[in-house]
Curated annotation (Swiss-Prot):
Binds 1 divalent metal cation per subunit. The gene is ispF. This is 2-C-methyl-D-erythritol 2,4-cyclodiphosphate synthase. Belongs to the IspF family. GO terms for biological process: isopentenyl diphosphate biosynthetic process, methylerythritol 4-phosphate pathway; terpenoid biosynthetic process. Its EC number is 4.6.1.12. It holds the Pfam family YgbB. PROSITE patterns: ISPF. Its cofactor is a divalent metal cation. One of its GO terms (molecular function) is 2-C-methyl-D-erythritol 2,4-cyclodiphosphate synthase activity.
Length: 159
């Protein structure tokens, strides 16, 4: 009988001018981006945490602390690959990724397929195993006021 594990990931980053908006490894044209030690890819960070959590391997901060200058400006897909590889080393395979980006703007619907494809390629999955959804916060709280962006992800692993 196979062993099924589920991991939940969440991340938030402040909106900042002079930064790129990178979501799921895709640069989205925008007059602002997300602030962070790495490239601040809020989606990649949430999925990374979900993989690590499902495999009981800690969290992204444990593996890539923001106090370490090696990760300054780092492409967050590096983090995602690392989590994938660690889970694989423990005998797990990623079965499914479901994620949500919560952001007032820019509107992301035109980037959905590109983001899904980039994530699927990075995780070595068929694209039909990667879901990316977009929501707004309906003008409520820091996300709704356009001051931050959040992402949530749930990952299923099988051994």
């Amino acid at each position: 009988m196979s062993e099924i594990r589920t991991g939940l990931g969440w991340d938030v980053h402040r909106i900042a001018t002079g930064r790129k908006m990178i979501l799921g490894g895709v640069t989205v044209p925008c007059e602002f981006g997300l602030e962070g030690h790495s490239d601040a890819d809020v989606l990649a960070h949430a999925i990374t945490d979900a993989i690590l959590g499902a495999a009981a391997l800690g969290d992204i901060g444990m593996h890539f602390p923001d106090s370490d200058p090696r990760w300054k400006g780092c492409d967050s897909l590096v983090f995602l690959r690392h989590a994938r590889d660690l889970a694989t080393q423990k005998g797990y395979r990623i079965v499914n990724v479901d994620s949500t980006i919560i952001l007032e703007r820019p509107k992301l619907k035109d980037f959905r397929q590109t983001i899904r494809e980039r994530l699927a390629e990075t995780l070595e999955l068929d694209v039909d195993r990667v879901s990316v959804k977009f929501k707004t916060a309906e003008k409520v709280g820091p996300v709704g006021e356009g001051r931050s962006a959040e992402s949530q992800a749930i990952v299923t692993l099988e051994k």
